[in-house]
């Protein structure tokens, strides 16, 4: 083997990572493309400068990482730059690692935004003028969904378990009128994600009907309890696997163009 030969490494930062399909997706892709690239899971029980230094400095061939829960917002203080999309979302799911003479610099991106936008494009196209979306959750995934909806001119309201704000209501505030005005409902919470498959958002499913569309950003399991209950009420229900694939390929474009 050529002494200059090296395998470029990527990975996923988060905790826990038992639910993730990313490693399997990228491994299969690299095998099919016959490229010298690999992808690993980096399950970090905490995130600080020391854990990042150990990760990045410990592998000189590590060129980029995806970031998942609970670190999409916690990673921000450690970044040298943010893409405009990531800055708008105040959340990052993709890191590009720049090697420098004195160490490294981390650059943050948000490919969830494009992944979500494309995965729900036909749903947003079916909204009547003035209709909007309810985004369940207020974390990094919810912020990415909000930016994507803003770019498509779709009004939206966050739904929280604990606090109200100018753009946020409680689950107990949801009424038939609110659903009629916001027939697209997005689950951007981890409720229902493997292994906690018996959990769900505290949503009033009885208010849904066949005019409603729900999108769950979770992809494991393929049919969450949220989706099952929404479908039983008559709503169209879709999971997040297509979004996962799109954001993964968008991340790979960023890393390969490094």
Question: How would you label these PLM feature ranges?
Answer:
Residues 14, 108-113, 120-124, 129-150:
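Glycine-rich adenosine-cofactor-binding loop
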Residues 166-238:
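Rossmann-like adenosine-cofactor binding region
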Residues 151-168:
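NAD(P)-binding Rossmann-fold cofactor-contacting core
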Residues 67-74, 141, 190-193, 220:
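Short glycine-rich anion-binding loops that position phosphate/pyrophosphate groups of nucleotides
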Residues 10, 132-133, 214:
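Conserved hydrophobic helix-helix packing surfaces used for dimerization/oligomerization
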Residues 16, 162, 220:
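Residues in the short beta-alpha loop(s) of Rossmann-like NAD(P)-binding domains
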Residues 118-122, 220, 235-258:
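Active-site capping/gating segments
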Residues 2-123:
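Phosphate/diphosphate ligand-binding glycine-rich loop within oxidoreductases
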């Amino acid at each position: 083997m050529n002494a200059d030969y090296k395998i470029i490494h990527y990975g996923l930062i988060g905790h826990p990572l038992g639910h993730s399909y990313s490693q399997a997706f990228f491994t299969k892709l690299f095998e099919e493309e016959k490229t010298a690239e690999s992808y690993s899971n980096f399950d970090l029980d905490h995130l600080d400068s020391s854990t990042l230094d150990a990760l990045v400095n410990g592998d000189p061939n590590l060129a980029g990482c995806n970031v998942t829960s609970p670190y999409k917002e916690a990673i921000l203080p450690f970044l040298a730059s943010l893409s405009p999309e990531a800055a708008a979302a105040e959340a990052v799911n993709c890191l590009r690692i720049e090697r420098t003479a004195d160490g490294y610099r981390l650059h943050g991106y948000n490919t969830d935004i494009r992944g979500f936008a494309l995965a729900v494009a036909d749903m947003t196209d079916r909204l009547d003028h003035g209709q909007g979306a309810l985004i369940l959750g207020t974390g990094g995934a919810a912020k990415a969904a909000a930016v994507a909806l803003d770019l498509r001119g779709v009004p939206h309201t966050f739904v929280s378990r604990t606090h109200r704000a100018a753009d946020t209501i409680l689950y107990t505030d949801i009424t038939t009128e609110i659903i009629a005005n916001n027939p697209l409902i997005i689950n951007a919470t981890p409720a229902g994600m493997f292994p906690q498959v018996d959990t769900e958002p505290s949503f009033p499913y009885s208010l849904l009907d066949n005019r409603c569309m729900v999108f769950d950003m979770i992809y494991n399991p393929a049919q969450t309890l949220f989706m099952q209950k929404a479908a039983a009420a008559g709503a169209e229900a879709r999971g997040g696997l297509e979004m996962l694939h799109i954001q993964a390929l968008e991340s790979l474009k960023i890393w390969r163009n490094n």
